[in-house]
From Swiss-Prot:
It comes from Natronomonas pharaonis (strain ATCC 35678 / DSM 2160 / CIP 103997 / JCM 8858 / NBRC 14720 / NCIMB 2260 / Gabara) (Halobacterium pharaonis). Signal peptide: none annotated. Belongs to the CDP-archaeol synthase family. One of its GO terms (molecular function) is CDP-2,3-bis-(O-geranylgeranyl)-sn-glycerol synthase activity. One of its GO terms (cellular component) is plasma membrane. Its cofactor is Mg(2+). InterPro entries: CarS, CarS_archaea. Its EC number is 2.7.7.67. This is CDP-archaeol synthase.
Length: 189
């Protein structure tokens, strides 16, 4: 039972787990924020926001596009494998809306985390415990719940969600450590 729950959790989240890794490999190019800062904006009291970049150089249009595309393509490939796996483990097929929501939601979660990092004075690559490990999960799940509600409710049962929130930080730290060891990342987190 636990093994099947873990298998379903990993399978269902693969389209969200892959995009940020692909973005690291395919990134570069024009930053989403265009190099802009928030220094020209003020709050209702006229106090200037910080002068940090909105997102930073690590969030690019190319990385976002390639990451999202990779997650969607992976979901479509998993759909082809699902009939062979479903006899052993009850893994789901991915409707296109769920595939896009999982993949793009993962990228959006990472972008939002970058925004939060800049607002809290953290530079690119600085650790942000908790946020670094779960940002993409929370946003991808939320977006999927909105655009593919029936599939989300059928797939992400409470035990599957628990498995995701327990496994993801471990997987995140492990894969980032490997990427760092292979010189693909400047920091091991």
């Amino acid at each position: 039972m636990v093994a099947e729950t873990v298998a379903i959790a990993v399978w269902a989240m693969l389209p969200a787990y892959v995009p940020n890794n692909v973005a690291v490999l395919a990134g570069g190019g024009r930053p989403i924020d265009g190099g802009r800062t928030l220094d020209k904006l003020t709050d209702e009291d006229g106090v200037l926001y910080d002068e940090n970049r909105i997102l930073g150089d690590g969030k690019t249009w190319r990385g976002t596009a390639f990451g999202t595309a990779a997650g969607v393509v992976l979901a479509l490939l998993l759909n082809q494998l699902q009939p062979f796996v479903a006899g052993t483990v009850g893994v789901p097929q991915f409707p296109i809306a769920a595939a896009v929501a999982l993949a793009f939601g993962a990228m959006l979660g990472d972008i939002l985390a970058s925004f939060l990092k800049r607002r809290t004075g953290r530079q690119r690559g600085a650790a942000f415990p908790g946020v670094d490990q779960l940002d993409f999960v929370i946003v991808s799940l939320a977006l999927t719940a909105i655009v593919a509600t029936g599939w989300f409710l059928a797939t992400f049962t409470l035990p599957v969600l628990v498995a995701i929130f327990v496994l993801t930080p471990v997987l995140h730290v492990s894969t980032n450590g490997l990427a760092y060891a292979f010189g693909l990342k400047d920091e091991p987190w």
